[in-house]
A protein has these predicted regions:
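Regulatory N- and C-terminal appendages and interdomain linkers associated
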Residues: 1-67, 74-84, 196, 243-266, ...
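ATP-dependent phospho-/nucleotidyl transfer catalytic cores
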Residues: 7, 160-272, 385-423
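Conserved ATP-binding subdomain of kinase catalytic cores across diverse folds
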Residues: 55-225, 300-301, 338
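Active-site acidic catalytic loop and adjacent metal/ATP-binding pocket
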Residues: 67-78, 88, 248-300
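Generic recognition of stable, solvent-exposed alpha-helical segments in well-folded globular domains
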Residues: 110, 173, 177-180, 222, ...
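Active-site activation/catalytic loop segments of kinase-like enzymes and analogous catalytic loops
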Residues: 113, 117, 294-338, 361-383, ...
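Short helix/strand-bridging catalytic loops that position acidic/His residues to coordinate divalent metals
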Residues: 162-171, 289-293, 306-313
Length: 423
């Protein structure tokens, strides 16, 4: 449902222009004057700004929930030398670009809370247990005004962090690193909950509520025609049988309601909530999460299905599925023991049962974020286009559902999920 930023995919058939700022409107307030106090706080020997440049942090059409720019600053220091500093600035979308819908998701309040409170708490828990870990980039500035929330973070690319090409997905080595890091995040969130009580209400809420039923059922009905039309062109054996299994708009929404309901008698974690390849960066053996806007308390099956469905490369997505769960579980057990979890730790068998119980996350992800993950960068892609009624919206939806990369993924996923009883 949420289509977040997509990093360049270095794909030759993409229609991305060479100039990253060609379609970017940079808010006028992002300037030297805004950054000077930040630099004075962050850089002990700061004297002055010599050069200030703002460029797009993502390719055109690849960021649907925020304005995100890379700020490059050359500064003079007290000894007369110069330093080059880089930051990522994220701020709220304007209303006419989808900001009203985004505001309803509490994305920026969640991310503000994660950077200000939760991530520091988690790191402290591990440090008290004698282990230094890192989970996310350093956030150097947070500002909340009536107009919205702004976050300024270190630019991980300056530390040689990179995304993996989303069109290819994660290989086994990267999946292993991510699954272990997810387990570290989840374990700390459980201990934090055990010691400090419930998280803020926004981490228990979702857009799947009765107030939004008409919107979601309308969106589901609107995309159904193009989805089925594209499906019939896929190289999927017994395609008509799979079409019969597609949920109605009401069934789709009811499934979403059930997925977001939390059973507090079960093992729950604070999920990252948007765990796909562009929200994970790598540098050597270091792995960090970015984009903490969708955090949600609930079953770890949410993050696991979302990650595997959206981001494991095609050659291992289904083949290594059970292995992925085992890798995550092994590290989760290690971390929960390290952090002295007082309750029974879920067994591997119990985790697999959770994956089945919450298996609707698989098709929810496959029909949502995966569609966009495998789409080459497109300046015309936007949340408004996705939801637009009429011929233009219909054409766009058919285009994304008939994308050969999406077809290849779904031709694998449909039989896999059917055999698990998840359709």
């Amino acid at each position: 449902m949420l289509y977040e930023k997509m990093a360049p995919n270095n794909n030759s058939d993409s229609n991305v222009p060479e100039n990253p700022n060609e379609y970017l409107v940079i808010p006028k307030w992002i300037n030297e004057e805004y950054f000077r106090p930040i630099l004075e706080k962050e850089v002990d020997d700061f004297v002055s700004i010599k050069k200030f440049t703002v460029i797009a942090a993502t390719q055109p059409g690849e960021n649907f929930t925020s304005v995100m720019v890379r700020v490059i600053v050359d500064i003079e220091t007290k000894d007369g030398s110069e330093k080059n500093l880089r930051y990522i600035l994220k701020t709220t979308l304007e209303t006419d670009k989808g900001g009203e819908l985004v505001a309803g998701m509490s994305l920026f309040p969640k991310e503000k809370e994660m950077y200000q409170v939760q991530i520091p708490n988690y790191i402290k828990l591990y440090k008290e247990a004698g282990v230094d870990i890192e989970l996310a980039p350093k956030c150097v500035h947070i500002e909340e005004t009536p107009e919205g929330i702004t976050l300024v973070m270190e630019d991980l690319k300056q530390q040689n962090f990179e995304n993996i090409d989303r069109l290819k997905g994660f290989d086994m080595e990267h999946m292993t690193s991510v699954l272990r890091k997810v387990a570290e995040l989840h374990a700390a969130s459980v201990i934090n909950h055990e010691r400090n009580g419930q998280y803020a209400d926004m981490f228990y809420q979702s857009l799947f509520n009765e107030k939004n039923r008409p919107m979601f059922e309308g969106m589901s009905a609107m995309r159904m025609v193009q989805y089925v039309e594209a499906m019939r062109q896929w190289n999927l054996p017994d395609v008509e049988e799979y079409i019969k299994l597609i949920p109605t708009p009401k069934e789709f929404f009811d499934s979403g309601l059930n997925l977001y309901n939390v059973d507090e008698s079960e093992f729950n974690v604070l999920n990252h909530g948007d765990l796909w390849c562009n929200n994970i960066m790598f540098s050597g053996d270091r792995t960090l999460f970015v984009d903490l806007q969708m955090a949600k308390w609930g079953s770890p099956a949410q993050d696991l299905w979302y990650l595997i469905t959206s981001s494991a490369s095609l050659d291992i997505k289904v083949k290594e599925f059970d292995h992925f769960i085992e890798i995550y579980h092994t590290r989760l057990v290690e971390c929960l023991k390290l952090l002295k979890y007082s309750k029974p730790i879920p067994t591997l068998k119990e985790l697999h049962i959770m994956m089945i119980k919450y298996g609707d996350w698989a098709m929810s992800t496959a029909n949502g974020v995966l569609v966009i993950v495998v789409l080459p960068s497109d300046k015309d892609a936007s949340i408004n286009t996705m939801m637009m009624p009429g011929p233009e919206g219909d054409a766009f939806r058919y285009m994304i559902f008939s994308n050969p990369r999406y077809e290849k993924a779904m031709v694998q996923l449909y039989p896999f999920l059917k055999n698990k009883g998840l359709l």
